[in-house]
Amino acid sequence: RKEKHLTRNGNSSYSFRRKIFFDRVHYSGETKMGLTFKQHLLNGIPSELPPLKPLDNSVPHAPTRPQVLSESEKKLAIQNSLRYFPAKWHSTLAPEFLQELEELGHIYMHRFRPDYDIFARPIHEYPSNCLSAASVMLMIHNNLDPSIAQFPHELITYGGNGSVFQNWAQYLIAMELLSKMNESQTLVVNSGHPLGLFPSNPDSPRVVISNGLVIPNYSSQLDYERMNALGVTQFGQMTAGSYMYIGPQGIVHGTTITLLNAARKYLEINNESNLSGILFITSGLGGMSGAQAKAAVIAGAVCIIAEVDSHAAVKRHQQGWLSELHYDLHSVILRAREAVNNGEAVSIGYVGNIVDLLEALIENNITPDLGSDQTSLHNPWL
């Protein structure tokens, strides 16, 4: 029987229509499969093959990764993926995984994505034999929460490639092991792959993690793309693969201090004054760069931030990092002038290119007092 192919809207574009914050039900009741949330976590890989899932366009998806594998390497990538499953499923999963590899550039195993909502639940809702293991599960769910993660269904939290796991099988196995482990065990995870539970003691770490550890001679961009496509390494960024992402809040203080010091150095603002009446132009409203907007408001400035990704801009606005969001340059210019004249502390988001914004400022004879950029460009070749 032919399964429905995974398809995208157009080439590589996605519908970003989604309410970022939605009502969550903290439940331990039954899901579609008749299992409770706790039972799902305890079961790990399901005993029956779940139905194939098409790509869900209610969330943003990772861009297609480069095709870097030879035909023999593609076979190896599929073999690496099939090791998580019983042999009776291999004839069904092998062509499906090949399709994901050729269409998406990586095997994510979308079929095994859970039906339950993923978000950081109250800790007592997690099945566990020790509080620290439940805490790790909570942290993983925070990293994969669709209102937080950049590409949640590809298990990427931020930075374009900051992965929690390489595929959904690894997630399911990790949840099962964490649900069952005790304080005399340690879970070892290598680039998303749960190696297993090992005897330890209560004073040892509950989880030992490594991500992307390779020797320098084999650490080029191409080496990474190849090993990632094979399913043998991942880039965890700083806090994605270590399960502790907190978004912009971790850098707001440093960004605020940097902005204040720039004004003191270049605009000769004294140490007792805020940045009232100062116009600060920058770009980037990604997972971390939302800190710029909040820092500008804390410092008392008027900030205009350009962001080409409408989904990222909307998310930062709805989360409260950004004061206002505009799609029209004319309205941005009018609002900025008004805010500067009134000495407001406000961040004004513009969905568009920073070059267009700068050109509009020139055309309207507006000279920014300070300029910066935080478009990190983690995936410059995608």
Please identify what each model-predicted range represents.
Residues 180-185, 300-301, 367:
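Structural alpha-beta junctions
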Residues 164, 282-283:
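A generic secondary-structure micro-motif detector
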Residues 5-254, 260-267, 271-272:
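N-terminal ligand-binding/catalytic initiation module
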Residues 171-176, 192-195, 288-291, 354-361:
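Short alpha-helical segments and helix-capping/turn motifs at coil-helix boundaries
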Residues 186-191, 209, 282, 305-306, ...:
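General beta-strand structural signal in soluble alpha/beta enzymes
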Residues 347-375, 379:
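Active-site/ligand-binding-proximal alpha/beta "capping" segment
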Residues 237-260, 264, 271, 276-279, ...:
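Catalytic or ion-translocation cores adjacent to nucleophile or general acid/base/metal-coordination motifs
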